[in-house]
Structures are given as C-alpha cells and as structure tokens.
C-alpha cells in the first residue's frame, strides 16, 4: 500500500471509532435517565406514605408541603 492509502485507512479508523463512541455515549445517557426516573419513583413511595400519616407529616413538613 502506498502512503496515501495508509493515511486514508487511518482516517477511516479514527472516524469510525469516533462515531461508535459518540453513539454509545448517547445510549448510556438514555439508560441512566431511565434508571434515575425509576429510583425517584421508588424514593417517592415512602414519602407518600409518610404524608398520609399525621405525626410523620408534621415531622417532615418540607417534604409533604
């Protein structure tokens, strides 16, 4: 192979690596968002139970409003 062909191959490898890395990064962001939403929902369940209990609601007025 000539130098020009080897340089072209190097550029193609770098471009392909960048595209794959960029795509995977966005996929992980989506998974993290879904996991964070699920965790938030799970944490909200005990708070809702607390807000329906008058002594607990009084103790945690900042959470129950």
From Swiss-Prot:
Modification note: Possibly amidated at Cys-64.
Propeptide segments, given as residue ranges: 22-48
Keyword flag Disulfide bond: yes
Main location: secreted
Recorded GO CC terms: extracellular region; host cell postsynaptic membrane
Keyword Chaperone listed: no
UniProt domain comment: The cysteine framework is I (CC-C-C). Alpha4/7 pattern.
Described function: Alpha-conotoxins act on postsynaptic membranes, they bind to the nicotinic acetylcholine receptors (nAChR) and thus inhibit them. At high doses (10 uM), the synthetic non-amidated toxin (residues 49-65) completely inhibits frog sciatic nerve-gastrocnemius muscle contractility. It also inhibit the cholinergic miniature excitatory postsynaptic currents (mEPSCs) frequency and amplitude of projection neurons in insects (D.melanogaster). In vivo, the toxin (100 ug/kg) shows good analgesic effects in mouse hot plate model and formalin test.
Protein name per Swiss-Prot or TrEMBL: Alpha-conotoxin-like Lv1.4
Biological source species: Conus lividus (Livid cone)
Lineage of source species: Eukaryota, Metazoa, Spiralia, Lophotrochozoa, Mollusca
């Amino acid at each position: 192979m000539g130098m020009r062909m080897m340089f072209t191959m190097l550029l193609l490898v770098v471009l392909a690596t960048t595209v794959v890395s960029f795509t995977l990064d966005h996929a992980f962001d989506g998974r993290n968002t879904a996991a964070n939403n699920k965790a938030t929902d799970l944490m909200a369940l005990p708070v809702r139970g607390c807000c329906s209990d008058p002594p607990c609601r009084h103790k945690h007025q900042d959470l129950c409003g």
